[in-house]
Amino acid sequence: MKQELIERFTRYVKIDTQSNEDSHTVPTTPGQIEFGKLLVEELKEIGLTEVTMDDNGYVMATLPANTDKDVPVIGFLAHLDTATDFTGKNVKPQIHENFDGNAITLNEELNVVLTPEQFPELPSYKGHTIITTDGTTLLGADDKAGLTEIMVAMNYLIHNPQIKHGKIRVAFTPDEEIGRGPAHFDVEAFGASFAYTMDGGPLGGLEYESFNAAGAKLTFNGTNTHPGTAKNKMRNATKLAMEFNSYLPVEEAPEYTEGYEGFYHLLSLNGDVEQSKAYYIIRDFDRENFEARKHNVENIVKQMQEKYGRDAVVLEMNDQYYNMLEKIEPVREIVDIAYEAMKSLNIEPNIHPIRGGTDGSQLSYMGLPTPNIFTGGENYHGKFEYVSVDVMEKAVQVIIEIARRFEEQA
């Protein structure tokens, strides 16, 4: 199993599947189509049935039941795309067997070193086989680790028919990293009662609470004149953006928050005297606090419009997804079975809120309750990203055990 995980994963991450927020196609990049087509062929080779890829790049497949029991149809999902935060082109995965727990020089020429000082969890992987980047790209373990684990688990179940299970549906979705993963997902066609995303992090992660999320695009319009004669004439759009940001609570930002604390995050800012554009994300677990944060943004905009004119600040704000807890609680047994599956494999479940979102956040509100399970990755979205193959193997075992337990309890 370990070699299959390494072979598939290192092959998959070499395919550039970064999504693109500025694209209006579905999926947003051709690499995701290329990857989806490859997976269709490999799912067929494994022996899955009803393997499809629709015009929007969604891949679905079925592992038929091998029991006569009336078992609910369960699904396992992962996403095709990788993050946009750092380049994902020409990924060169580096395999470190029997890792010694010390610093790893990822790139000597660029002096990129993965150190325990910067990443304290690193020594806990001593003795593991870990896969890192070469220091010039992200790795793409988010979410090609989860995708690989689903492929390997399905292959294992097919070759081990003594493990009884109900019908299992598999889906690989595009554009999760830019919040569009479920946008064209056909829940009815998928046909599962509930599902699990394999899109978590370290060993034991079991998540069924996510942020409530919104995005706010702000356009600041200024008036540019010659600086030598600008008195009482110039309105500097960049300074308007700075002023807006100054009204937000300094301590309510990602770098100062954890656990159940929400935040405002300035994701990008660009422009000049004439016009500047800022993009914020707004996050909170509590729906009431979430709404209050959005109202705060609206109130700041209103105050600035009263001060500088209505055209000075233009706000576009949209909800992106909601806390899935509300939809998971009524079917709590799906969390309990995952919890029991981990315990039976001597994995200590680590239940904590997702300080982010998964496809499951939106799918849960579309009628498909979908908690999230660990994959073994660390330091996602950057050059220090790595994954433990040993933990990936545990994730595969969890998938298998969840399927087995649903059949056993039917």
From Swiss-Prot:
Q: Which UniProt keywords apply?
A: Aminopeptidase, Cytoplasm, Hydrolase, Metal-binding, Metalloprotease, Protease, Zinc
Cofactor dependence is on: Zn(2+)
Give GO terms for biological process. Answer: peptide catabolic process; proteolysis
Q: Name one Pfam family in it.
A: M20_dimer
The UniProt catalytic activity note for this protein reads: Release of the N-terminal residue from a tripeptide
State the free-text cofactor note. Answer: Binds 2 Zn(2+) ions per subunit.
| Predominant place of localization | cytoplasm
- Per the Swiss-Prot or TrEMBL record, the active site comprises D81, E176 (proton acceptor)
Which compartment or compartments is the protein found in?
Cytoplasm
- Return the SUPFAM superfamilies for the record: Bacterial exopeptidase dimerisation domain (SSF55031), Zn-dependent exopeptidases (SSF53187)
Q: Where does the chain bind Zn(2+) 2?
A: D142, E177, H381
State the top-level EC class: hydrolase
> Which residues are Zn(2+) 1-binding?
H79, D142, D199
Q: Which GO terms describe its cellular component?
A: cytosol
What family does this belong to? Belongs to the peptidase M20B family.
Protein name per the record: Peptidase T
The species this protein belongs to is Bacillus cereus (strain AH187)
- What lineage does UniProt assign to this protein's organism? Bacteria, Bacillati, Bacillota, Bacilli, Bacillales
Gene from which this protein is expressed:
pepT
